[in-house]
Amino acid sequence: MPAPRGPLRATFLALVAFGLLLQIDLSDVTNVTSSTKVPTSTSNRNSVDNATSSGPTTGINMTTTHESSVHNVRNNEIMKVLAILFYIVTGTSIFSFIAVLVAVVYSSCCKHPGRFRFADEEAVNLLDDTDDSGGSSPFGSGSRRGSQIPAGFCSSSPYQRLETRDWDEEEEASAARERMKHDPENVIYFRKDGNLDTSFVNPNYGRGSPLTIESHLSDNEEDPIRYYVSVYDELTASEMEEPSNSTSWQIPKLMKVAMQPVSLRDPEYD
């Protein structure tokens, strides 16, 4: 049956050709698929997670950087304040040290030479002629000599308290001077330079003597008499002649007062 064989052959050849074409297309598709990586669900999830996590990390880094800069600025301000305080304290300390040093040098340079030192309170005790009851003195109520003798002076002070004298009346003043001549109360006269020229009783104690010695006898009779020296400026003879009548009377200016006993030979009374 040659008639149907022709159409069948043609159909068969067409099918074979179609199959070859289909095979070629499938191989191309397979090559394309193998060369191109198609993302799977897992890779997509990882990509999304990475993208999601990268966003907040950048924000955190920016916040941390800002906080660090603010912290550094605060630290710088604190350091500036501390530096200012340090300079102030250091400057004050240096200024105080210099002031103290200048004061010490000044006091050392102005200190009078010799072994005697100023002691105003002791000078008041030495010069005070006022009794405990408030007696008067030739120096007037406003003078330092007219001040009250402290309580317990005789028992606590190393200086001998001189006899209380009342200079209100001229007769009493003359009598007091006579008593001093006969009872000089262990007051010794020296030259103004402080050297012991002649040891004798000074009858003019309190009346222009430039330097006097106060004696103090210890409670123990075996102990020698201790002497304390005090130096005064001399007054003019006219001022010392009649203290009660002198309008220009002034207390002898204290120059020096001994702070320690001095060694002297016994006074020679005439």
From Swiss-Prot:
Record-linked Pfam families: gpUL132 (PF11359)
Cell location: Virion membrane
Entry's transmembrane regions: 84-104
Disulphide linkage map: none
Entry superkingdom: Viruses
Keyword Signal set for record: yes
Keywords: Membrane, Signal, Transmembrane, Transmembrane helix, Viral envelope protein, Virion
Protein's UniProt keywords contain Transmembrane helix: yes
Bias-annotated ranges (Polar residues): 44-62
GO-annotated cellular components: plasma membrane; viral envelope; virion membrane
Chain segments carrying region Disordered: 33-62, 129-179
Membrane disposition: Single-pass membrane protein
Residue ranges, compositional bias (Low complexity): 33-43, 133-147
Signal peptide: 1-27
Family classification: Belongs to the HHV-5 UL132 family.
Name of the featured protein: Envelope glycoprotein UL132
Originating gene: UL132
